[in-house]
Amino acid sequence: MKRLIHYIREFLFPPKCILCRGLLKGEESDICHRCRTETDEYPQGKLKLQFVDRVAAVWYYKGNVRLSLHRFKFRQGSFLAEPYGKLMAMKALREDLTEVEMITWVPISPIRKLIRGYDQDELLARVISRELGIPCGRLLKKIRHNRPQSGISGYARRRANVLGVYQALSPEEIAGRRILLVDDILTTGATVSECARVLLTAGAEEVNCVVVASAHHNNP
């Protein structure tokens, strides 16, 4: 019966590539062959951020990756957390980011979560937690509703926009621990750096980070 339901579901809702939305063929899973060959993976060890020990991104933030992440965040694309999270877990393993005791995420404001219906970074973090077998918890809270970073240009302005926006929760779960911080998109890195600073101030031993995609260029 379960197999029959599976076939009916695939007939009515054929699986599509998470990047280009084209129909998947044969043994293709999540990403079509064309997107796998044409989408640039982000190189290992290229990202450097203040307050963060190591950072890894699955892809460059451009083309179909950019469009797909826009669906994820703004067009009820919460289902994309599953394939994204699995890819992020594999990336974290390949880049040795998994020697941590806790996984957490960059939180959105309560207002934005209410409007969107979900916190996309929390969904990613929980998939990564399940895949890696590492506990996941809410260690940060957004205490001020600031301007969206996407509407601000320049690292200095973005950095100023996030100062004092985040607060550490449960210091006893943070102190002395190595933490993997999860975010969806990295541009200048200002938000991730501020979240890492807050975690370190609360006593974290080390903060690593993994993101779906990055448009980041290292800042001096």
Regions from the language model: what does each represent?
Residues 1-183, 187-220:
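Glycine-rich phosphate/pyrophosphate-handling loop used in enzymes and phosphotransfer proteins
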